[in-house]
Amino acid sequence: MKDSFLIKRGRFTPFAVIAMILLPTVTGILCMCFGRMKLPVSDVINSICSIFTGEIDNLQVYSVVVNLRLPRILMAIIVGAGLTCAGDTFQSLFSNPLATPDILGVTSGTCVGAILAIILSCSILETQLIALVFGLVSVFFTLKIAGKNNSGSMVYLVLAGVIASSLFNAIGSLLKYTADPQDKLPEITYWLMGSFTSATYKKLIVGSPLILIGIAIIFLLRWRLNILSLSEDEAKSSG
């Protein structure tokens, strides 16, 4: 990898680290300014500072920023980081830039798990865990189908993922057909759309540790993932 002002000797430069911290922070503050109630940047910053100082100038503005928009922004940042790490990990594991959770059937599997959990009126944590289990089942199912071919071609892996996605999509459609159209079906639809409207601090406390732990594990294994992304000859030459 060639050195640049962002990466030198395989490591991020101080400028890159500062940029990665400032960009989501500034973007998040700007996003909290927009909505049905438009707010100036100064009011948003003052409301955030009020969390630590305890001095609230405008209770309405404070409620909108801190209780509504801030948890949505935090959840969007954490979920985005998790999706980024998941996509990059898939591509490294399978040495294929096309190997994404969508193509390998993971997305469809997790959707089936979430739909089933919502129909059974499970809690937030139970819904996430069941979705995770079904996602792993989808991965194993895809690998099992692709393993039937001895050539080891990534084309068969992608085709197996398409088969898994079609199967789990069909199961998901059947489950949605049996769901209560007045209660469960809207909740399922909002979940599948990935809306952050219902984001709360409680949901952040429940879901964030799972995502952050996964990101930490991926970070600790980053060098091994880099080796897996190389071809066989490149990996041997690297030791």
Residue ranges and their predicted role:
Residues 1-238:
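Alpha-helical transmembrane segments in inner-membrane proteins
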